[in-house]
Amino acid sequence: MKNPYDSKKIESYFFMFWKKNNLFKKKLNSNKDNFCIILPPPNITGDLHVGHAFQQSIIDIFIRYNYMKGNNVLLQSGIDHAGISTQSILEKKIYFYENKNRFDYGRKNFIKEIWKWKEESEKKICYQINKLGCFTDLNKIRFTMDKDSCKAVNNVFLKLYKDKLIYKKKKLMHWDVKLRTVISDLEIENREINGKLWYIKYFFSENSNKNSKLNFLEIATTRPETIFGDVAVAVNPLDARYNNLIGKYIKVPLTNRSIPIIQDDYVKMDYGSGCVKITPGHDFNDFSICKNHKLNIINILTISGKICKKPKVYDFNGNSVSDTNIKIPKELQGLSISEARNNIVYKLNRKEYITKFEYKKVVLPFGDRSGDILEPMLTNQWYIKTKKLSEVAIEAVKEKKIKFISKQYENMYFGWMENIKDWCISRQLWWGHRIPIWYDVNKNQYPGISESDVRDNFKINKEEILTQEEDVLDTWFSSAIWSFASLGWPQKSIKFDTFHPTNLIISGFDIIYFWISRMIMLTMYIIKDSFGNPQIPFKNIFITGLIRDKNGIKMSKSKGNVIDPIDIIDGISLEDLIKKRTKEISNIKLIKKIEKITKKEFPNGIQNHGADAVRLSMASISCSNRKINIDIKKIIGYKNFCNKLWNVSKFIIINLKNKKVSFEEKEINLHKIDNWILHKYNKVFKYYKYNIDNFRLDLVVNILYEFIWHQFCDWYIENSKIIFKNNIISRLNNTCYTLFFILENSLKMLHPFIPFITEEIWKNLSKMVRNERKNTTILEFFPKKYLFLKKDNSFNEIECIKNIITCIRKLKFEKKTKFNKLVDVCFINNSYEEKIIILNNIEIIKNIAFVKNVDFSRSIPKNVLKKDIKIINNIKIYIYN
């Protein structure tokens, strides 16, 4: 073994070694258990980030662990087309580089550009998965829009449509005016911003309140720009101020249109004046009131967020209504929302319709992709009825067919599923799965995989024009069937028959609603077992927290705190890191901010740490916390561990070389310190297996780190140095055997976590022993417990000696004596048994603690201060030069 440890060289060699030797393509054995994980498909939107490295490290650990146990194993990789994200990013790119938008390209050419970009992006993603060491055959990688996935998506849609679980209806939804598509409630980010509350006079219609001195009502609103969509003014039925006004009419400002005054419990008497304008086309609460009171709905906005020329009017069921009375002043038509607001406020002020305004904090929905304010909009969308599907999915978790890890996330799942709404599955995008519905000129719907399929099934001749639905499916639709679609369904597939349901899915808690719940619902509805019962998609759900930076802040490009795992693995200069973080950012202020943050955190760039250190650090933080802070210092600590493992392995291999060592356990005459370390090993092996089987990788890392560094290296290796240095013949064979046994089995336990370095060490170690050793760790049988421990007091004896040595080291530190300086030690007032233990292990104490002479005394000498004495297990110790 060469010095020093070179992670780059080792990692590049072994991934090619696994690939060349077809280790990803293990033959199936029907006598073995099956273990499968579907890799959560990363979006094709760009480079993988630390969050991906976190999940993929965890996944690969379980895959390698089960491979070494002899199970049939599959890690099915894939990539998600990420409809809205991909389209949004590519639109920004073509605008940034070409000053064009997608309409300049047209749908067909724009989609071609995305496919080109997808090919480049896929190469990068595969490279990153390889670099991390994931044990998967990337020649078999799937894509959520490949031909087989399209077949699966169409099959599922048509099955749900046939079973009347899919329908199309006009509903009020969040609309992204920038992306020009409907957005799910789960894809919004509510932000508090500074706003205003205007108090506007709404005058009574002629003869509506002629017997009263009151000629107007004061209406408080944060959205004066939507007054042309008003259909009523509402007051609380308990508000005595307005009881006599119910049923009267009032005029919409700047128009001659009259609207009724109604009463509704929703209105808060202490909000503003206690009178609220009802604008159901642009407010969700108003939409509910409209339904209850059977009012019309007016839409005053275009899909691009401009004030329209001619408002669209619908009844409370969403049917079109002709109403020529509803008009918008010409000078407002075509204005943006903010322009219209300013213009309308100006007009109202001129007419003295605004009595006052207040500054007010308002919470508004923003699109998490576009970053723009979303508008409530009445649109015609496709939905899945989820109530029936959710009931079966809830029972699967309640009956423990599916287990959440940790259990706390079950409540989150139940809370969502028990109050689930129908799922809006259509998006007004170009990139995605086109909905497999065709229309004739009369807007009749025809479901089918293709136009020819529709014509054949419904006997429609070629002269009749058929047009496919323009909308695409929500990205989460194809993701929801990924557990079975990625394994080859709907075709007959050995892969599907062998590995479905899968064993484990790994997901962040933030997509339990988006992904996990929907996978369970659709899988259990579509896939049935041989008895016709619903089949679950996976048996265990490992929920992780979200990776944040070391300060607990969410990582984002605009914050300048995103870390590419490849940069941690290979290293990157400060200059290149700044270039990478500011690429495609045109805002000068933001660029300077990112530069400042980067220089402060990484003044010398990022050093290379290697994939193994990254994997080990990711496993060490794989707990159930919702927020997981990642700090490079932690990764440095695990790189140091890899260095330690390398150096101790080198020491063992050098000292075992050319020595005739017996590897037959029955021929080994264990010394008490051999017995002690093997006892420690057995305990570690037990805890390792228990915790990895219970998904506690963080505890496994702690156990292995503590054992290898602080027990094996700090104590047993130090003792073995004495044996080799002094050539103690009687101890050589059992010491060599013990060193080999511990290193061999530690490498096996470590391999799922740090596969590259363990392979290199194994390659060197296996040259020294019997031919049945494989040339790769992963093909070896899983570690075993040591079965020939001596049943005596040797373990406790060595623990006592360890404590004594620790005391001597502490005394040296307190006296500012160098750790390797020889000192004399005095033990005071010991029992006969304690004295025997010390004398029996005097050489260990002398060599490890750097002790020259050992004395025993019945009392503390007068010249020794109490502070200079340490007491351990009733043994008093002091040192002197």
Swiss-Prot record:
This protein's UniProt keywords: Aminoacyl-tRNA synthetase, ATP-binding, Cytoplasm, Ligase, Nucleotide-binding, Protein biosynthesis
Gene Ontology CC entries for this record: cytosol
Catalytic activity: tRNA(Val) + L-valine + ATP = L-valyl-tRNA(Val) + AMP + diphosphate
GO biological process: valyl-tRNA aminoacylation
GO molecular-function terms, A-Z: aminoacyl-tRNA deacylase activity; ATP binding; valine-tRNA ligase activity
Residue span of motif 'KMSKS' region: 554-558
EC numbers for this chain: 6.1.1.9
Pfam families (UniProt xref): Anticodon_1, tRNA-synt_1
SUPFAM superfamilies: Anticodon-binding domain of a subclass of class I aminoacyl-tRNA synthetases, Nucleotidylyl transferase, ValRS/IleRS/LeuRS editing domain
Domain notes: ValRS has two distinct active sites: one for aminoacylation and one for editing. The misactivated threonine is translocated from the active site to the editing site.
HAMAP family attached to this UniProt entry: Val_tRNA_synth_type1 (MF_02004)
Role summary: Catalyzes the attachment of valine to tRNA(Val). As ValRS can inadvertently accommodate and process structurally similar amino acids such as threonine, to avoid such errors, it has a 'posttransfer' editing activity that hydrolyzes mischarged Thr-tRNA(Val) in a tRNA-dependent manner.
UniProt-listed PANTHER family: VALINE--TRNA LIGASE, CHLOROPLASTIC_MITOCHONDRIAL 2, VALYL-TRNA SYNTHETASES
Protein name: Valine--tRNA ligase
Organism of derivation: Wigglesworthia glossinidia brevipalpis
